[in-house]
Design a protein with these regions (language model features):
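Extended, domain-scale alpha-helical bundle/helix-rich regions
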Residues: 1-12
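Sequence-specific dsDNA recognition surfaces
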Residues: 14-19, 34-52, 66-96, 116
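Non-catalytic DNA-recognition/assembly elements of restriction-modification systems
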Residues: 14-45, 177-203
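Short, well-ordered beta-strand elements within core beta-sheets of diverse protein domains
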Residues: 20-23, 85, 127-131, 172-178
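A short beta-sheet element
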Residues: 64-65, 83-146, 163-165
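Specificity-determining recognition surfaces
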Residues: 144-176
Length: 203
């Protein structure tokens, strides 16, 4: 994707580690994920969202690890909790358009929450990212989190042996390469076009 001379250089937001993953174009900047987010929070402790809190009514959709696919949202394992219970775990509430990241199995994969349900909450093993869209496009950030650049940072710092996991505090510190917004838009369009071609070939 070509760079345009007319595009401004990205402003550096927050501190950047000297140990950056790779060299990037001059107008891009490395920015920690927490500095690209209005809010980052993880799901409730297991005792705060148990089967006894589930409901058969379509009230507040619970985002399960199985919904966070490696290639997008997977609409399976559908479970709901009540509006009343969701109000007791406000930091774990999620809106459509937010990004959610799995903390395990495998750690670091991310999806954009769809608008198929009116309201959502996280399971205990996921993290929500409310994107600062004035700095980075949601689709671009989602692609960046799912890239090898981000995954290498995650897997260099995972915990556990049988159930390898990451954490909210670690995810906040990992770095994202941020181009100017217009260039982000062109990159997203190019990636989506390539995915579309792959889907046509695989059909």
């Amino acid at each position: 994707v070509p760079q345009l001379d007319s595009e401004p250089e990205v402003e550096q937001i927050g501190e950047v580690s000297e140990d950056v993953p790779l060299e990037i174009p001059a107008k891009w900047k490395w920015v920690k994920l927490e500095n690209l987010s209005r809010e980052m929070a993880d799901g409730p402790f297991g005792s705060n969202l148990k089967k006894e809190h589930y409901t058969n009514k379509h009230e507040v959709r619970i985002i399960q690890l199985s919904n966070i696919g490696e290639h997008g949202w997977r609409d399976e394992n559908v479970k709901y909790t009540t509006h009343t219970h969701a109000e007791t775990i406000p930091r774990s509430r999620v809106n459509s358009g937010d990004i959610v990241i799995a903390k395990m199995m495998p750690a670091g994969r991310a999806v954009i929450v769809p608008d198929s349900d009116a309201s959502y909450v996280l399971c205990s093993d996921a993290v929500k990212v409310v994107v600062k869209t004035e700095l980075i496009l949601t689709k671009f950030l989602n692609f960046a989190i799912n890239s090898q650049i981000f995954k290498q940072q995650v897997y260099a710092n995972v915990q556990g042996t049988t159930r390898v996991r990451t954490s909210l505090s670690k995810l906040k510190t990992y770095q994202i390469p941020v181009p100017p917004l217009e260039e982000q838009s062109r990159i997203v369009a190019k990636i989506e076009a390539l995915f579309s071609q792959v889907e046509k070939i695989s059909v």
